[in-house]
């Protein structure tokens, strides 16, 4: 019997003496014993969990990198941990220095990691994921399963345990396992920074000499939380800002000014509905595969005080594009804004084009996986593939453990079982890539 179960039984046994009129001192003794037994049970669970994690190369690697904080623009420490691990396990490693994002004051000397077996600097198969996380850092911790103990149901919690250090750890172990059996397989690893902040790391790799024309690689396996399913594609991503200009005045005499907020509200109302309006009526496109295009007015600013007519207002909008091109979507949005404001010159719209991309279709020609279509974005479109004139076209796969539904939240977590299954999934994708030649 587990000590925790014994504690529960002891707790239940205190009810009968009370009903029989026993003195409260008996209850105090029983409660004291309950606390002691519960503490012993917790200690026993912690010792068991520690042994399970420490005895597994996969779980111990995952713990090592999850215990290192690596919020975007602060990835050098986890990068060094991975460089050390990969070097100790037979990989040649290169650091690809990546400047921090312009909107961050970090002084971190961060880098992408490019790794390959000694003597194979141009691998045919690349497994890649990201080593940065969203803020805030949440400490790594373990939770024993409820009821009968099942190793697979141990829960691993903390920032990055899912997105995407689970993929990083599982990829490495899968690669090491394959190389142990087939040491001549040209297998490489690419771990990038800043995926969570616009994909700076992948853009840096894409623009580097390692991304050749034609490519020396024929398969890319990307790691993100996909519930152990193979992703057949994800929506496109488009962002834009709307600004309104007004004239400030005392709120008691609003006719002396012009409200920027009143100017922007009908525009935002129109924007908010663009995903629900048919294209023929001026809406954004939908598709059978990705569903409807969705828009999120994520930030809205305006005004100085409640008793002042606002002279400025602005909004930032994110679009998850289900079909069509970026240019078409921008034109639809521009027309919708112009119609909503009657062509007012007080309204302006801007697009940060460098971060926009259309829907991304991915390869799924490997048997044995359930398929999934996702709404979230990745840095897959940030890697330009120069295979236009090549006889062999590059395959792109997206797979990983955990679910995106908890990935950025306070309860980010996955089970030991899912993490271990991911190693088998990546191994299956590697095997398929090897068969391609």
From Swiss-Prot:
Membership in a protein family: Belongs to the peptidase M20A family.
GO CC, alphabetical: extracellular region
UniProt-annotated binding residues for Zn(2+) 1: 163, 196
Biological process according to GO: proteolysis
Binding-site residues for Zn(2+) 2, renumbered to this chain: 163
Cofactor binding, note field: Binds 2 Zn(2+) ions per subunit.
Taxonomic classification: Eukaryota, Fungi, Dikarya, Ascomycota, Pezizomycotina
Name the UniProt record assigns to this protein: Probable carboxypeptidase HCBG_00059
